[in-house]
């Protein structure tokens, strides 16, 4: 007894101390005293009874392949001990003859499994079967418990649940051993944990067609989805239903789910195990979806669904909504125009539910309460429940969020007496008002944690289902949702950030985990501010610098992600690109595009020809968006995900993506801006004006020469000079106009030129600076740029190293308003770059300040 208590204590310690499920229990050191899994690239053999559950057998076959991924060779599979199974892995559910034998020999404690739900135990046993010296035993309380134990071992040897759906590389090992001990993840806190593939056109549907050659989701596609769900320790799925019909499209879909161990359901508006498309495709034959006028046909439709699903684990949705996911009585897509009579609808729904349960009882041959059902309180249906609609006591009542991840309703203490329990339908993808959210993952796990913690603490723990759209690119929220549904108590506010770190460690390795998790957390925070579909030029304040701030944050994040991407081994880059680099680049580019549009509109309204530069930037960003998406479709994993990133996301004018294709945001251009010369008038800000030299008001050209723009010269934009340099500069000048407020009686003018040496006039080259109509000040700007002892280190070297010369002149101001500053070269080689007019606010700056606003 004492020995048993000690082993149970150790078991509890394992549960409490380790991550999903157990950290640091596998080693490459075969001399560590552990149980050998791989030795010199040869994996240990596996024994499983041939009469065990099909789902167990399929999982074991996948384990064989996982060993091959890790060491290059498949584990041999046997149905009974042989000479090759002296050391082996034994896998079995509680019904397995081998597990029964171990229990009978008291090598497994039956109490740890019997009556438990989806629990596994993984432990090393000596002499478990005749002819077997030692085995790693994976025993499950039921089929799924066993499957979870098998896939836990797969994770331990280095195969991520996302090896297929995110192309996570498998680390190769020649030797592996598992530490001795008893390991379990216990039972799940939430009984049914699943996904809803929804809003699947055009991305998922196109990818499936490109990958499997079908216009629907067939069993080969769904088998990959089921495997992912099981590797993540989920057990439930609502299949895609916009244009597909899970049950009707491929007769192998449902058996594949049953064989693999996934429980099927239908969405909140698809009652009685029937897909909406099964009705929509036969409307002419069936008539209208109206229970008042067409009950006989609808009841038969319901009977066929239950009859088809009576021998599997499918959870049957009951209730009824309108045709096409609308309120009962409303036309498809016109919920907002419909004014229902709630009292009549409640009576009708109660009648429908009673009739549905009669059908369930008759078709299954047992009381309706013995077949699991759920009723979804989605949108208007919650109102009926609040007004007193009666729900049978054995039915799961499924609450929902507001489609944006905020919980609408939770049960009261009195309602918790409902024996059927409560569920939650949660979204990280949505089609609906105020605007679709389909393109990228924009839901921070902090928000999911907050709302699902609330959900769990209020007793909603029977069923959780997550609307994941096309499944990709929701890899991380799916993982967090499944982990959290298994054990909501595991993460609180103090340790929540451990989850993204552990997730990144599993996908990219320990050495990359901290940085990848930091980038993932920042992306989630930035993306969670506003969806890409809701973002536009007016979202952030451009005047306060807020818009530039958020764009700069994305620029830095993109640089960090690209830096880490380039540091990864080649085989990890596809996974990193899917999880982090693509969404960061895509959203950073969208932010840049709308910021550019905001700047374009602002400068256009001011008459500033720089508006055209920003218009060009909008168009370049729009083009880059298509390049990024094309790269996702055509380049990642050799084009494996072709079609998965074709969702429209630019051009919304209403809630839906009814526009034909992505549309470049509207820009405005100042006509003939490139042909127009001069005319700039600057506005002061914060006590100074900064002007790029090319933005003059007027110029005067000398005979046989002209002022010429030198693009990209200098520290910010460009330079201007008289060309050719050999020309006589007499009579030339350039004038800059700017406004000054009342109360300014003196300004300090800083003229920034290129660091031209005195190549012609040894005493130095000169220009004059003055206000129009006033006496100008002569400036010798390079007379001290020489190698004389008093100049070489003090002036020349520092100046030429900075490549600019800054000279300061003070000028008196007689009146406020528009001023005209005239600069006239007296010698050749003057290259003007920037002019700063300071009247009390300028702070010395290496780039001489951001150019002031102007009009033209």
Identify the residue ranges that each predicted region occupies.
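Feature activates predominantly on carbohydrate-active enzymes
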Residues: 108-293, 310, 374-378, 388-406, ...
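Contiguous, structured surface segment used for ligand recognition
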Residues: 20-187
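Acidic/histidine-rich, surface-exposed loop or edge segments in extracytoplasmic proteins
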Residues: 38-53, 205-209, 324-338
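Histidine-centered catalytic/metal-binding microenvironments
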Residues: 548-682
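Bacterial Sec-dependent N-terminal signal peptides
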Residues: 1-22
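Structured mid-domain segments that build the active-site/substrate or prosthetic-cofactor binding neighborhood
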Residues: 230, 235-238, 244, 252, ...
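Gly/Pro-rich turn-and-neighbor structural signature
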Residues: 170-177, 241-242, 248-259, 286-419, ...
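Extracytoplasmic
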Residues: 654-856
